[in-house]
Structure formats: structure tokens, C-alpha cells
Amino acid sequence: MKHTLSVLVEDESGVLTRIAGLFARRGFNIESLAVGPTEKLGISRITMVVPSDERTIEQLTKQLYKLVNILKVEDITNLPTVERELMLIKLRVSTFERTEALDIINIFRAKVVDLSEDFLIIEVTGDPGKIVAIEQILSKFTISEIVRTGKISLVRESNVNTRSLLKEY
């Protein structure tokens, strides 16, 4: 199972290196990683997606707390969250294909951020499912390049779990 960990750290040099070193020593893979400042000066949030079981995540959490500059580690996998990713896609499209590509882009509420005679660069923001869906649909065209951010996530204060709502339909 994939686990999403939210880690608050002091914004000091070497913190990410120590975390990556811990994962490497234990043989764990980090599937997705996003780091950025929080609302508190000097504090950063690291959001990681780690494929592993519950027991291993518990051990990993304990190991993370032993590192310097780690303030809080939370497995938010089963909590109601808002999740987002950003993807940029460079798409080669002919003049003939452009209208169809733009229709798809509009349906997904994506944005064209650059265009030339033969290429579009598209910005897509959304939950991981939306990102995967538009990538699959646009694969009918020639995708020249793709870059994706790691997943970012915050726990919902409303406690509305949209994942469980989606399973009902």
C-alpha cells in the first residue's frame, strides 16, 4: 500500500539529505516527494508517498523522529485530505489535431501556458486521479515531455472524506 507522510522539519541545510539517507539505508523507495515552506517562518513541510506496509511505516516514523530537525511525522494516508499535483506536458500537435487537444484541455480545466506552431505546453493541477486521466487521454497525441511535482496534501478540518464518497458511486 502507498502511504502519504507529512513531515514538519526545521528549515535547515542537510535535513532532506538525512531523510533520504535514512530511506536509502533501510532500502525504502520514495515514490513522490514535495518540499516547501509552511505558514511558520523557518518550518518546512515534506510530503512523501512511500510504498510500504503499516508496520514498516510505523518503524520508519520512529526512525524519522530520531533525526535532528524533525518536528512532526504524520501518516495521513487514511485521513480525509485535499491532495494536489501539478503536471506540465509538452504536446506535439499538428494544426489538424490542435482543436481536439484544446477541447480535452478545456474539459480538464487545464491551461495552455505556451504554444508554437507544432507544440503546446499544458499545465494541469488536480488530484492524482485527474493527473493520470489527462495524461492517458492526451497520449493519443505525441507527448514530447512530461514533468510532475510530488503530491502535496493537507488534512481536511471538515472531516469530509472524498475518497469514501467516490467509492459509493
From Swiss-Prot:
Reaction equation(s) it catalyzes: 2 pyruvate + H(+) = (2S)-2-acetolactate + CO2
Organism: Guillardia theta
Keyword field: Amino-acid biosynthesis, Branched-chain amino acid biosynthesis, Chloroplast, Plastid, Transferase
Name of the protein this chain belongs to: Acetolactate synthase small subunit
ACT domain mapped to chain residues: 4-78
Entry's EC annotation: 2.2.1.6
4Fe-4S in keyword set: no
One record GO biological process: L-valine biosynthetic process
Cellular component terms per the entry's GO annotation: chloroplast; cytosol
Disulfide bonds: none
Subunit-level organization: Dimer of large and small chains.
Main location: plastid
Keyword Cytoplasm applies: no
Pathway: Amino-acid biosynthesis; L-isoleucine biosynthesis; L-isoleucine from 2-oxobutanoate: step 1/4; Amino-acid biosynthesis; L-valine biosynthesis; L-valine from pyruvate: step 1/4
GO MF assignments: acetolactate synthase activity; acetolactate synthase regulator activity
Entry-linked Pfam families: ACT_AHAS_ss, ALS_ss_C
Domain of life (superkingdom): Eukaryota
Compartment(s) where it occurs, according to its Swiss-Prot or TrEMBL record: Plastid, Chloroplast
